[in-house]
Amino acid sequence: SSDLRVVTLPDKKLIFQVRTIFLRSKEMIVVLSLFMFSIVAAMIWLMAGNVSALYDDAALGALDVPLKFSLASFVVFSFLSFEMSYKLRRYKLDECMDTVTHAKRKIFLAQGIVFAVVIFAFFIVFNIWWLISFIKYRNFNCWHGKFIIQTVLNMLLSHFFLPCCAAAMGMSASLLFHRINGCLGLVLFTLLGSPLSNYLGEMFYSFSRDVSINIFPFLRLFDVFPPSLNYAPIFAFGQSVLPYRWLTVLFWFMLSLFVISLKTGERNRRFRAAPAVFALFAFAFLVVSQIPASRVA
């Protein structure tokens, strides 16, 4: 087991190098600072507002706001991860580690560890927001056991698992495409997963009434963000954690790991089966996510 650990895991020095490159990158720090500022500003604005104790929906609407940052989190961490992969390539760490077994794989793993730590820090911030909201709206009737569980699951999915998936997708995009094409691919994914996709599906259907082209089954592949239910926010919490959304996020995460393991895998029998395993899991999650039962609470 010790030999396997030496082969697979990056050492502390490599993680420190990747972290140093990350912290010295002005664009990384500026983007993360702006993202943090927007979160804190929204938190202060909501906490400073007055909500009538007679309307639970008003409180639920305020509690729904952190979910709306899910799309922004995906954009931030997918593009930063994509950019970081190119930045590490410019530093040529893999060439400096030619004598180290599985150098390229270790560099990507070190990058993943650094991003997981950053994502976890933002996850803590969102949970602090939720706790402050709980204190402010503690007298509202919405605070029952099922709602609290749904809120915790929403925080875990929208602000930890999905950003981790975004970081993995950014790394895999850097291995598959050139810089411009990779950026366009991430933009396209974001648009297809955003509420704009509903208008796109309706547009296709309305313009093809004779043949009835329905692209909504295809758009389900990108349904990883919380649904927009401003008119009835109480449903947003339950609808956001239905099984299909977890499965869809896991599908893209496993697909990204498949690409990373395939592109960074050296000829070694210990890792030869890794891409196949990730591909098998991705296919299984995709199939189960399309089952109608996965969309029922």
Which functions belong to the PLM regions below?
Residues A42-V76, F82-E83, L109-H178:
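Secretory targeting signals
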Residues S2, A48-S52, L184-F271, I291-A297:
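Terminal transmembrane helical anchor/hairpin motif
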Residues V30-L34, R179-S197, P275-A279:
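Pore- or pathway-lining transmembrane helices of multi-pass membrane proteins that form conduits
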Residues F82-V118:
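Helix-loop-helix units of permease transmembrane domains in multi-pass membrane transporters
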Residues R24-M43, V76-S78, V114-I124, M203-P217:
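Alpha-helical transmembrane segments of integral membrane proteins, especially early/N-terminal helices
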